Amino acid sequence: MLLGVITLFPDMFQSIVRYGIVGRAIRRGILSIKLWNPRLFTYDRHHSVDARPYGGGPGMLMMIEPLRNAINQAKDELGNNIKVIYLSPQGRKLKQKYVYKLAYDHQKLILVCGRYQGIDERLIQTEIDEEWSIGDYILSGGELAAMVLIDTISRVLPGVLGNQDSKESDSFSKERLDCPHYTRPETFDGMKVPSVLLSGNHDEIHRWKQKQALGRTWIKRPDLLNYIQLTNEEKNLLSEFKNEYLLSLNKKTRK
């Protein structure tokens, strides 16, 4: 997969391309990332990339020409069939199912990172195919959002993760949270690993993990359950979890 990034701060991406999952994807030849700085596509002596907004208002806006020139250069180098994405708080909120779609439906993406108060609306109208947001909060620029998108796309590309099951069991991979996980030591400060995980009974372990994942979703992100079509078995597991959870709460209040 080819990813192009339009950014005023290309050095910010040096760590993500060298380490972790993204670095592994690049070393294995599964992912390639190229960076273009709009400042290199300016023609005035100050290399201006921002200006005051018409109509007044606080802050500065990124100018259309340097951005468009950088995008055009990226398109020339990356080739045809490219989707251009603007990381923006006005964009559609990113979810795991959309990550799969972006990763599997497109071999080439260009990510445009805004700065200041944003970018000239005319660029959005003429050059941007989609706007995506990573959440309802404000960042200083689109670079961190682009890194989030790059990382999450890298995880779902075939051959990147050492264990294919890892991405399938991740939180949100099936529109639900992941189950709790435990490792050594078996007992820590009096807290023990659930006995079922030590039993060796794979069917019971699988059942426990399913129930805990559904229960954790119900407790922490109940909104996600509105989008899940539960099987009868999953409904029973969730009902069991609720009963056990409420029973444990009653015991705590009695103490």
From Swiss-Prot:
GO molecular function per UniProt: tRNA (guanine(37)-N1)-methyltransferase activity
Assigned GO CC terms: cytosol
Q: Name one GO biological process term.
A: tRNA N1-guanine methylation
Compartments, as annotated in UniProt? Cytoplasm
EC number(s) recorded for this UniProt protein? 2.1.1.228
Q: Does the keyword Metal-binding apply?
A: no
Query: Superkingdom, according to UniProt?
Result: Bacteria
The record lists the membrane-crossing segments as none
Q: Does the keyword Transferase apply?
A: yes
- List the catalysed reactions: guanosine(37) in tRNA + S-adenosyl-L-methionine = N(1)-methylguanosine(37) in tRNA + S-adenosyl-L-homocysteine + H(+)
The subunit field of the Swiss-Prot or TrEMBL record says:
Homodimer.
Concerning its family, UniProt says: Belongs to the RNA methyltransferase TrmD family.
What's the protein here called? tRNA (guanine-N(1)-)-methyltransferase
